[in-house]
């Protein structure tokens, strides 16, 4: 049965740390895609959480019309949570600042919200540049994501009430916070007899910059440390260089 969705507001939260190279393009994509929400009679807002940037990220975000909030501790979980804390919408959409959602993707999100059967979800991803090993790894992730279902942090949509009931993203984790949140949302969805949906008809285009900024050896070393550390690596910011060393 379709949910009563008249008068909804969608809050789009964009965590950003030193994203001056991509933030304008990302926000323009979000703004263009958000017209879908207006067409179904919903309001929307765009919130950028400046995660202690040292470049022009906050200024560029404000110039694009986003509401900008500040989180002083460099951690993706804290940045998303800080943005969600000021969000006024009944639904939250988290989009990374190096990702570029399409109107077709937002239309799918709107349809899931209107269905009343979905508590939240994510989408498969597609790199904006083709690198063979990275493309293959992305395919593996997309298959795993749909099977589990696990949401990639680059794009997560969620009922705001459910997000707050779960306490948001874990502040213990510097990476893999999206998988942790996915597991907890899956548990809640079963209690509510709703679904966590991984969309796949219109994948999220996301930047392949990490593939070029960090060597294959560096990526493999991180995966090995993560495996041997049994997850402890995810709680150590210094070990998560590809997310926190500021290379852009």
Features from the language model and the residues they span:
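Acidic donor-binding/catalytic loop of UDP-sugar-dependent glycosyltransferases
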Residues: 56, 95-111, 183
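A short, conserved alpha-helix in the catalytic core of glycosyltransferases
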Residues: 162-167, 173-193
């Amino acid at each position: 049965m379709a949910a009563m969705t008249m008068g909804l507001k969608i809050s789009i939260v964009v965590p950003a740390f030193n994203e001056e190279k991509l933030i304008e393009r990302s926000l323009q994509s979000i703004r263009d895609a958000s017209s879908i929400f207006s067409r179904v009679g919903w309001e929307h807002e765009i919130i950028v959480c400046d995660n202690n940037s040292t470049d022009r990220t906050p200024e560029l975000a404000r110039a694009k019309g986003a509401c900008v909030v500040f989180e002083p501790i460099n951690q993706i979980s804290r940045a998303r949570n800080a943005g969600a804390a000021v969000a006024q919408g009944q639904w939250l959409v988290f989009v990374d600042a190096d990702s570029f959602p399409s109107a077709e993707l937002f239309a799918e999100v709107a349809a899931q919200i209107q269905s009343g059967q979905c508590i939240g979800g994510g989408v498969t991803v597609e790199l904006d540049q083709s690198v063979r090993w990275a493309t293959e790894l992305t395919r593996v992730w997309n298959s795993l994501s749909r099977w589990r279902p696990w949401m990639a942090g680059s794009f997560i949509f969620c009922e705001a009430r459910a997000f707050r009931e779960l306490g948001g993203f874990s502040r213990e984790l510097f990476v893999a916070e999206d998988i942790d949140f996915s597991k907890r949302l899956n548990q809640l969805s079963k209690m509510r007899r709703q679904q966590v949906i991984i969309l796949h008809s219109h994948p999220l285009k996301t930047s392949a910059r990490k593939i070029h900024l960090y060597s294959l050896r560096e990526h493999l070393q991180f995966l090995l440390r993560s495996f041997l550390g049994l997850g402890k690596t995810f709680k150590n910011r210094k070990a998560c260089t590809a997310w926190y060393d500021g290379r852009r």
